[in-house]
Amino acid sequence: MSKEKVILAYSGGLDTSVAITWLKKDYDVVSVCMDVGEGKDLDFIHDKALKVGAVESYVIDVKDEFATDYVLVAHQSHAYYEQKYPLVSALSRPLISKKLVEIAHQIGATTIAHGCTGKGNDQVRFEVSIAALDLNLKVIAPVREWKWSREEEIYYAKENGVPVPADLDNPYSVDQNLWGRANECGILENPWNQAPEEAFGITTSPEQAPDMPEYIEIEFSEGVPVSLNGEVLKLADLIQKLNEIAGKHGVGRIDHVENRLVGIKSREIYECPGAVTLLTAHKEIEDLTLVREVAHFKPIIENELSNLIYNALWFSSATQALIAYIKETQKVVNGTAKVKLYKGSAQVVARKSPSSLYDENLATYTSADTFDQDAAVGFIKLWGLPTKVHSEVQKSAK
């Protein structure tokens, strides 16, 4: 009699490898690893899952879908959770959940498993997303259920023939995708400890970065980055290339104590060279092209959208409504930003746009000025009228 199938979100690490062994007693385990741009050896991960005991092993390249359907939303909405974190991990979880559900439907599985602990945000993101897509799917969290210490987990792995990674003594917990790299644990858990250089993986120390600045040009079409230094690229490829270029200059290092969804504070080290560079450049093109009222209101939407995505609500109607608003604002966001990369900073030093609302003849103080300064007197009188009336009423009341 065949066992029920379970779909396991598989990373290739110790937790999910042990999970295969733990689950296969009661299920036929189908492992699924998604490539969101973390740069792992996918062939190795595929084979390892089968070696440990999975009956099937899927490795799926979703970088392009991740870039266009998820990262682009964060990019166009300048998504920084608590004004610092560009939502690196939070963005990939809805997509991973979506693919897990799709595969479950394809092979007739009724259960999905993940390798999250009981104190992180990701358990919530996976389970809320899966429930939003299919309420009938059961979710198992082996790591949360077994409550083993690291030593007990290693002992179980060795007893059951699960390969123990050679870098297991590495104190850090790292998650990486196209949009950046997140690092926690070890010495980083004490917020008074400066993050050592070994905690960083995709950026050069600003002190060790090149002594000469590098200038790059990023072109946007309706808010979408379409070319880098004149070369037209797919979004995923453009982000990867920017990660290399800006990372070399130490751009995008973020040290942040954040408020987790589960109620605790956590110290995180993020490296987001491509993200920070793109977000900086995009904002400058918006400054040229958005009317004042949209430019002033959009940050309110951006902040709320960042919170919703961080807090596991990608598939909520509120999130989708705010995404629709953001997309509407991007129709005029066309242009090119010139960015100076130098020792940890990404600074826009020039910008141009065919949709620009900047009129040099109105802005200039030279003889080319076309601004009607005589109109200022009447404007000031009407603009200040409510304040004048209020002041007069207050005086008469005394």
Curated annotation (Swiss-Prot):
It comes from Streptococcus pneumoniae (strain Hungary19A-6). It catalyses: L-citrulline + L-aspartate + ATP = 2-(N(omega)-L-arginino)succinate + AMP + diphosphate + H(+). GO terms for biological process: argininosuccinate metabolic process; L-arginine biosynthetic process; urea cycle. It is found in: Cytoplasm. L-aspartate binds at residues 117, 121-122. ATP binds at residues 9-17, 115. It holds the Pfam family Arginosuc_synth. L-citrulline binds at residues 85, 121, 125, 173, 258, 270. Keywords: Amino-acid biosynthesis, Arginine biosynthesis, ATP-binding, Cytoplasm, Ligase, Nucleotide-binding. Its EC number is 6.3.4.5. This is Argininosuccinate synthase. GO terms for cellular component: cytoplasm. Pathway: Amino-acid biosynthesis; L-arginine biosynthesis; L-arginine from L-ornithine and carbamoyl phosphate: step 2/3. Belongs to the argininosuccinate synthase family. Type 1 subfamily. GO terms for molecular function: argininosuccinate synthase activity; ATP binding. CDD domains: ASS (cd01999). Homotetramer.
